[in-house]
């Protein structure tokens, strides 16, 4: 299963649109506020569906949830490619949200279920870190392929058509996963409606208990807040790279979009190679810290500092420094993510792992739904740099309330 987990991570991140998403929307004539609104719509839909789909994954089977996820993604990609209109993009974002909610937390829970069955739960950071490393390798390769596609076609639309192929392969991969990774299912007698309600009540009642433990609550908000800031701001690297690419005295015989494609593709390739290394070595970096909670706290603060530098340097027109800060921000996120997942997995019951991780993801999407349009509005009004600075200051302000503390709480204590 180790190789299948890595294959999942690799194929999942062959999202050829990722390095060019904001540039694609700008090419279609959207403002930063409209782009932020699309991101917000996506996150609101994810927020509404996150916990119910996590419960369904725990109650009806994680494999079926993953199959539904990738089917929704495929429909979304097709709409983005075929119908370049804002109203259609809204529908495509809703379908994308369905894909995210069925997948969110579910595959992590399948990894942890495999580790539990094999009796190697102590390897959770290594397993998840290596899976994430494969994901970043997929992203690195996707950046180069996407750059080639954009360079050849002269348009960003092609990246959505190309993204369909790896996600079809993901459908076959998910179908090959063993049934044992579905986890413990709750059996309720009666009609299918009674079964659905009974399972939601049974499983849902357990995630409500998570909110009664301050230690777990801080961990959930710590992880979700940092990820919300990262995901809300990371794509603003693209217009910064665009400005830098057009300012460089290279490839002048090619068109503007072609020059941007080369610079964006190469730099995203390097970013994802670095983040792949960071994810695969998360456990080593964790060992250098005094404890897992200390590592979680330090990476939060360092990440916020990098975002502030990126925003301030963009504001002042020092794009090279901004790109370097974003490079560090991407790297840190992929070092940090396995740590926070490992921290939370020590506090969440195994049988509701998918639900518990989906709770964290729901908190993240709720925050993103608020942050994304605000960033877009600020970017339209005062520029991308100012928007990033304001977000970094806000993230720093709330840290004292999110600081996690040492001491391990066994999952059984939560029940």
Give the label of every model feature segment.
Residues 31, 61-62, 85, 154-155, ...:
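A helix-boundary/kink motif common to multi-pass secondary transporters
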